[in-house]
Structure formats: structure tokens, C-alpha cells
């Protein structure tokens, strides 16, 4: 009798251990890693995805990274007389923890973002000018806008405080299957509501004045996203956070993060243009038929193809940008119609015609950056002095009054327009591009999971387009791919994460 009881207890204990190991990812035997993964796009999203995929899947998986242009994507630079300058994403927030980690892990150096004084121009006059003295700036802001600047700072800080939860979630390997679920995990219905309301509507409801919104908020949206306060409130908050102090950049250019991540991930760079992706059944070396993805791409005039277990698309699925076709998927992959904002970056080395903005003499002008309001009727969104990516400090005072100025505009500047802005200039270079989405709430974000093992990173740009947002999306997609490959459903779309993790040491 005693022996029978002992055997029963032993059997039950064995069953309990088996069930426990099956229910716990850390105790479960992982599925063999995939043989090959394709990442399409070598901007910050694609290269950071490759980096995180390598960390999760290990050293044996082969990762191919496709890029038809230069590594770095929209983190491009422009040349002015032998010096490189940032064309697009130029500053990084001190709380962008993924970018900070990349720079540290890759051994890169940083520089503080260009300083200098800022003015706001409304088409007739400078309605606000910064002073070198902090107390003078406070007095100016309070005199013109009351305490709205302080209230705005508090509003942005509240959004940032909730947004920072993503780093804790990702450090514990939690992933989300949609942009909406990710945002809801951070800020609940408030964050989802911000996607569906304009910044103007949100801030008006919060009691901010029309003058403050026109003169302080709209110019920031114009320089950051080429749009105004009719963008969604979430991307508006992201934009306003870039008004904080402590902004920085990577010495040598922010694109060095991308090339560094490519090297660190030990990925194979394929300099070709992906034409289409098709799901096919292929017999692998195990002898079993397996569903895989055939990626067909072009290098020069030659067409090539290869098969992959997992594919991550890290380029906007916009016909003007990537033009990738998805063949024979059932159900069909959804069409993406998100319009991207056309913007033109112009770098000019010359002497600014300060009389456009002020009646003061040139030597008394003093401003390094001028932002414009919506009603300025000027043909630019902003203009500012910039340093080359190699300069650690702001440019030295010029002996001849010439600096390199970066101009953002909706349309390509004519020579006549450049001559209106400058008393004289030595050099001008222009770059028209589709820089970020055109925001028009309510926003419906594209799916992250396009098919069983086919993922899309850039849907997060419908919430906000920024270097850190792309890195967050990349980490999320890598975690999602890893957990879905291994059947770790309890690591995806978990409710109550904030409260759950808050109680952990």
C-alpha cells in the first residue's frame, strides 16, 4: 500500500513538473532557431531590428539586410564644400534610451546639439526672441503668454513619463502585436485618443490660447514635421519634447549608428531593391515541406531570389518609397495608402539678409534660428545655422558674416528666393524627400503582423516618426518574431504590465 502511494505521488509530481515546464517559457525547450531572416531597409529601423534579432535568435541564424540606397536611410547627410551636415533626423532626446544604448555599445562619440538664440517670425515681425539670459526669457514668456509655457512643459512631461514605460516592458521581453496595443499599454485610452484628435483640438481643450498655439506651438510643428497643429496630438507631444535641453547628436553623423548596428548584428548587406515577396512551400534539409517567403530582388539589371523563414519590412510600404509587391497571399496583404510629407532641405553657405526679419543692423541681429508661423507668408518653414557632423562645438563667430544655414521648405527654393534670403552666398545644395508621414487624424495604424512570419516596422510612424520610435518598433518586432516563433503567447499583448512590473524588484 505504501509503495503504491509513493508511486502515485511520484507520478503526480512528474506530471506537475511536466506541466510547469510546458507552461513557462523559461523552462520550455525552445524551438530550433530559423535558418534565415530577411530585413528590408537599412535605416535606423532595419539595422536596429537586425541587432535585436541577432540578440534573440543567436549566432547561427543568417540575417540578410536589403538596402537599395545607402545604409542609414533617412538619416542622410549633405555635403557643403567638403563638410557633411545632417539633412534629416539631427537631434536626439536625452531620454531616448535605445539610441543612448546604441551609441554606448558601438563606442561612438556624441556632440551637443547646436545652441544659439531662436526667434519666431509671423510674416511682419519677430513676435518672440530669445535672450542669453534665462530670467529675461522667463519674463518675456510670462509677459506675452502668462504661464502657458510652464503648463505646456508639464503636459509634455506627463506624456513622456507614461511613454518611458516602454523601456521597462521591453527590458522584460514583452511585445505587442499592434501599434494601438503598444500605445494602450503605455498610456491607456488617453494615448489612443491622442492618435484620433488633432494637437490643436487637444490643446484648445486644455485651455491654451490661440496666440500661444499660433506663435509657440505651430512653428515647432513646421520645423519638425513640415505641418501645423492639425497633426495628431501624440506626434505633437513627441515634437514638443524636442524643445527640451540636453539634445545631442552622434559625432560624424547619426547614420553611423546604422552602419555600426549592421556590423554588430553580423548581418549580410545586400545592395539591391526588393521587388516582391511571395509565400511558397519549400522542402528544407529536414525533408519536411515548410512554408517560407521568397524574396525577389534586383541588383543592377540582374534579378535574384532567396527563401526566408522570417521577413521584417523596415521601409515605408508606400509606392513612391519602396514599391514592394506581395504576391499570392491568402488573404491578400493590405494596401498601404499613407501619404508621406514632401519636404525640401536646403543648405546655403552665405550671409543672411537679416532685414527680412528685423530692422536691426546685421551685427545686432544675434539669432541663430528663425521659425515661422503658419500665417507668415514666407516661403520657408525655418532657417538656422548648423554645424558639420564633425564639429564638437557651435560654429565660431564668422569674420565675413557667412555661415552654413539649413532651410526647411515645402517646395524647392528658386535662385530668386535664395537671393532674397541672403545678401550673398557661395554655395547652395538642395535635397527634396519624403521625410515623414502626413498626419491627418484620426489615424489608423498599419498592422505589424502582415502574415504569419512577415512583420512591418514602419506602421509606428503613424503615431510619430522619429529615430527612437523606429528603434522601439524594431525591438518590438524582434521580440514579437521571437515569441511567435517559439510559441510564447504569454509574452505578447499582456494586460496590466505597468502594475505587474511595478511590484517587481
Swiss-Prot record:
Function summary: Prenylcysteine oxidase that cleaves the thioether bond of prenyl-L-cysteines, such as farnesylcysteine and geranylgeranylcysteine. Only active against free prenylcysteines and not prenylcysteine residues within prenylated proteins or peptides. Involved in the final step in the degradation of prenylated proteins, by degrading prenylcysteines after the protein has been degraded.
GO BP terms: prenylated protein catabolic process; prenylcysteine catabolic process
GO cellular component: lysosome
Species this chain originates from: Macaca fascicularis (Crab-eating macaque)
EC top class named in words: oxidoreductase
Name listed for the protein in its UniProt record: Prenylcysteine oxidase 1
UniProt key word Glycoprotein: yes
Cellular location(s): Lysosome
Enzyme Commission number(s) from the entry: 1.8.3.5
Keyword Magnesium: no
Similarity field: Belongs to the prenylcysteine oxidase family.
Matching Pfam families: NAD_binding_8, Prenylcys_lyase
UniProt signal peptide: 1-27
Classification of source organism: Eukaryota, Metazoa, Chordata, Craniata, Vertebrata
Amino acid at each position: 500500500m505504501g509503495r503504491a502511494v509513493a508511486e502515485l505521488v511520484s507520478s503526480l509530481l512528474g506530471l506537475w513538473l511536466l506541466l510547469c515546464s510546458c507552461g513557462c517559457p523559461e523552462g520550455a525547450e525552445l524551438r530550433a532557431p530559423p535558418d534565415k531572416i530577411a530585413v528590408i531597409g537599412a535605416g535606423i529601423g532595419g539595422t536596429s531590428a537586425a541587432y535585436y534579432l541577432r540578440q534573440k535568435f543567436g549566432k547561427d541564424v543568417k540575417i540578410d539586410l536589403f538596402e537599395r540606397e545607402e545604409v542609414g536611410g533617412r538619416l542622410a547627410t549633405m555635403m557643403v564644400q567638403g563638410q557633411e551636415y545632417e539633412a534629416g533626423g539631427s537631434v536626439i532626446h536625452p531620454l531616448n534610451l535605445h539610441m543612448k544604448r546604441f551609441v554606448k555599445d558601438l563606442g561612438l562619440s556624441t556632440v551637443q546639439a547646436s545652441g544659439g538664440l531662436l526667434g519666431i517670425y509671423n510674416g511682419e515681425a519677430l513676435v518672440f526672441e530669445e535672450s542669453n539670459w534665462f530670467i529675461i526669457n522667463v519674463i518675456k514668456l510670462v509677459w506675452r503668454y502668462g504661464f502657458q509655457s510652464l503648463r505646456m512643459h508639464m503636459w509634455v512631461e506627463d506624456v513622456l513619463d507614461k511613454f518611458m514605460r516602454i523601456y521597462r516592458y521591453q527590458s522584460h521581453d514583452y511585445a505587442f502585436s499592434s501599434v494601438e496595443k503598444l500605445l494602450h499599454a503605455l498610456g491607456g485610452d488617453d494615448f489612443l485618443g491622442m492618435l484620433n484628435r488633432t494637437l490643436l483640438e487637444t490643446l484648445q481643450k486644455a485651455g491654451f490660447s490661440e496666440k500661444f498655439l499660433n506663435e509657440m506651438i505651430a512653428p515647432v510643428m513646421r520645423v519638425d514635421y513640415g505641418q501645423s497643429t492639425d497633426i495628431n496630438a501624440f506626434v505633437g507631444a513627441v515634437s514638443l519634447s524636442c524643445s527640451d535641453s540636453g539634445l545631442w547628436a552622434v559625432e560624424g553623423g547619426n547614420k553611423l549608428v546604422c552602419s555600426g548596428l549592421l556590423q554588430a548584428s553580423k548581418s549580410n548587406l545586400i545592395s539591391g531593391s526588393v521587388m516582391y515577396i511571395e509565400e511558397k512551400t519549400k522542402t528544407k534539409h529536414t525533408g519536411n515541406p515548410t512554408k517560407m517567403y521568397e524574396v525577389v530582388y534586383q541588383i543592377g539589371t540582374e534579378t535574384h531570389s532567396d527563401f526566408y523563414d522570417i521577413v521584417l519590412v523596415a521601409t515605408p510600404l508606400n509606392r513612391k518609397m519602396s514599391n514592394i509587391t506581395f504576391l499570392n497571399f491568402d488573404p491578400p496583404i493590405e494596401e498601404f495608402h499613407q501619404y508621406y510629407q514632401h519636404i525640401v532641405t536646403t543648405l546655403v553657405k552665405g550671409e543672411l539678409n537679416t532685414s527680412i526679419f528685423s530692422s536691426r543692423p546685421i551685427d545686432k541681429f544675434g539669432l541663430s534660428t528663425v521659425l515661422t508661423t503658419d500665417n507668415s507668408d514666407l516661403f520657408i518653414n525655418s532657417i538656422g545655422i548648423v554645424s558639420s557632423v564633425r564639429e564638437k562645438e557651435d560654429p565660431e563667430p564668422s569674420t565675413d558674416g557667412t555661415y552654413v544655414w539649413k532651410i526647411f521648405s515645402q517646395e524647392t527654393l528658386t535662385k530668386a528666393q535664395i537671393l532674397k534670403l541672403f545678401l550673398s552666398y557661395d554655395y547652395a545644395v538642395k535635397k527634396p524627400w519624403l521625410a515623414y508621414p502626413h498626419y491627418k487624424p484620426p489615424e489608423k495604424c498599419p498592422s505589424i503582423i502582415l502574415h504569419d512570419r512577415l512583420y512591418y516596422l514602419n506602421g509606428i510612424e503613424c503615431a510619430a516618426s522619429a529615430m527612437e520610435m523606429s528603434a522601439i518598433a524594431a525591438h518590438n518586432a524582434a521580440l514579437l518574431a521571437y515569441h511567435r516563433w517559439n510559441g510564447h503567447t504569454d509574452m505578447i499583448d499582456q494586460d496590466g504590465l505597468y502594475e505587474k512590473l511595478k511590484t517587481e524588484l
